[in-house]
Amino acid sequence: MSKALANMPGDDYFRHPPVFDTYAEHRAYLKFRHAVALRHFARLGFDQDGLAGLITVADPEHADTYWANPLAHPFSTITPADLIRVDGDSTETVDGQRRVNIAAFNIHAEIHRARPDVQAVIHLHTVYGRAFSAFARKLPPLTQDACPFFEDHEVFDDYTGLVLAKDDGRRIAKQLRGHKAILLKNHGLVTVGETLDAAAWWFTLLDTCCHVQLLADAAGGAEPIPAEVARLTGQQLGSHLLGWNSYQPLHEATLARNPDLAAMAPALPPQTPALAR
């Protein structure tokens, strides 16, 4: 281990996600965080493209079923009760009354299947993510914030229209491999996380990094961080635990702006620190 990594605070320095005794408690927690994440992305303007945009979260109990925001429901008013549970094979809604965006779900379900370590998958149509994706190139480590994605994201450069076939979703999942993000050419960004909060942080950060890169390109280019330094910085900042912790201020700020949703927060285990709420 390098001295720089050895000097990093250990995992015990940071907060950790809560642990639940029952599936029901865990599910209620995930659905609440799911709704808060959608409200967060609404504030960023990531829900302005009609029917596009999906966050899926694996159900903690029922294999190959995933909680999703329903088709055509505004992110800005979503609540846990609005979320639907969708079967990964049939794409039928098994809990709730609404339908899911099939094209997006075909991507998400195949990623979940290929990556059982992933709790959440996020794909939203953002301005900067779509613009940068059109170049079909990886994001350079231009800044410290981009380093968590250095050697930890991929590009899918075969845009063929809506992903209406499961095979197309499988190809995207295969290209993603074990990474935390993938840029879909002419389409946008996808991030994944071992926790929903980490996936939400990676998505927020990745879109910001795309914005920075586009600004730098427009100004005539910029010098990226050397590979060995970018790799080290990515190891320092790119863990899913750091991603989870980095998202907590955004979660708390979203609750402060949405008291109606904050009032729906489920009870947490007694040992859970306040920051994990």
Curated annotation (Swiss-Prot):
It comes from the Bacteria. Activated by ascorbate. GO terms for molecular function: actin filament binding; metal ion binding; oxidoreductase activity. GO terms for biological process: antibiotic biosynthetic process. The keyword Metal-binding applies. Its EC number is 1.13.11.83, 1.13.12.23. Its cofactor is Fe(2+). It holds the Pfam family Aldolase_II. GO terms for cellular component: cytoskeleton. Disruption phenotype: Cells lacking this gene are unable to produce clorobiocin. Keywords: Antibiotic biosynthesis, Iron, Metal-binding, Oxidoreductase. Pathway: Antibiotic biosynthesis. Signal peptide: none annotated. It catalyses: 3-dimethylallyl-4-hydroxyphenylpyruvate + O2 = 3-dimethylallyl-4-hydroxymandelate + CO2; 3-dimethylallyl-4-hydroxymandelate + O2 = 3-dimethylallyl-4-hydroxybenzoate + CO2 + H2O. Involved in the biosynthesis of ring A of the aminocoumarin antibiotic clorobiocin. Catalyzes two consecutive oxidative decarboxylations of 3-dimethylallyl-4-hydroxyphenylpyruvate (3DMA-4HPP) to yield 3-dimethylallyl-4-hydroxybenzoate (3DMA-4HB) via the 3-dimethylallyl-4-hydroxymandelic acid (3DMA-4HMA) intermediate. Homotetramer. Belongs to the aldolase class II family. This is 4-hydroxy-3-prenylphenylpyruvate oxygenase/4-hydroxy-3-prenylbenzoate synthase. It comes from Streptomyces roseochromogenus subsp. oscitans.
